[in-house]
Design a protein with these regions (language model features):
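Non-heme Fe(II) oxygenase catalytic core, chiefly the N-lobe of the double-stranded beta-helix
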Residues: 2-245
Length: 245
């Protein structure tokens, strides 16, 4: 029960939408994709002959979208760049569970579109679950209307700890130097102050940070509100190493 089949959404194939490496999609084709995403939340592209990160890079290039790089992001995950547009999802070991989340919703900047590609299928499991956040918001509003009203009014502040060196055993082990794109503590403090974060240094050289209040619900110009935050992931799996309450 609840499992989506291919009849539940649109699967795009080369027969329906030809995409050639090096050839940008025309306006009408991009409108078709945008309309499908607005209706379903995602689109599945199948049989486009991708087998490598470079193939995937070329596929993405056809959409002519701005490149949101891992380096400039505040992503908590340890990731490796494969091309200028493609990076790994997370370097944590398979036994680390990655809970449902909204990509980088705990930061001031986040991507507007995401593409996923499986280069090597998992030996067991490995599927990427997708949840319609507009429908999740409707369900939550019906169950907890006061909570939703509070989210709308106040937003959410996030606190997490960043280690001094990358911890690949953690789903959120990116170091503060890499996350903030700095080389020393003075630069880190200046960067966080500029962005409105509060922070404190930990005894092991790590850094505990707290964001300013960020939106928890938004409509992103699409005409329908969505539940956009990291409340589920933070409650289920975030490990804050400092001793703040």
């Amino acid at each position: 029960e609840g499992t989506m089949t291919t009849s539940s959404f649109t699967v795009m194939t080369p027969a329906k939408l030809p995409i050639s490496v090096g050839t940008p999609l025309d306006g009408p084709s991009k409108t078709v994709i945008s309309d499908l995403i607005n209706a379903h939340g995602f689109v599945v592209f199948r049989d486009y002959g991708m087998s490598t990160a470079q193939d995937f890079h070329g596929f993405i290039e056809a959409f002519n979208l701005p490149n949101f790089t891992y380096t400039e992001s505040f992503s908590n995950a340890v990731r490796h760049n494969r091309t200028s547009r493609v990076f790994t999802a997370n370097e944590a070991p398979p036994e680390v569970e990655i809970f449902l989340h909204h990509e980088m919703a705990q930061t001031l900047t986040f991507p507007g579109q995401l593409f996923f590609f499986c280069e090597k299928p998992a030996e067991k499991g490995g599927a990427t679950p997708i949840c319609r956040s507009d429908l999740a918001l409707l369900a939550l509003t019906a169950l907890r209307p006061e909570f939703v009203s509070k989210l709308r009014a106040l937003g959410v502040r996030y606190r997490n700890s960043m280690p001094i060196d990358a911890d690949v055993a953690s789903g959120q082990g990116r170091s503060w130097k890499d996350t903030l794109n700095v080389s020393n503590a003075e630069q880190a403090e200046a960067r966080l102050t500029e962005l409105g974060y509060s922070f404190r240094w930990l005894n092991d050289g790590g850094l505990s940070v707290q964001t300013p209040a960020l939106m928890a619900i938004d409509e992103f110009g699409r005409g329908k509100d969505v539940f956009f935050n990291q409340i589920v992931a933070a409650a289920a799996s975030w490990d804050n190493a400092d001793d703040d309450p």
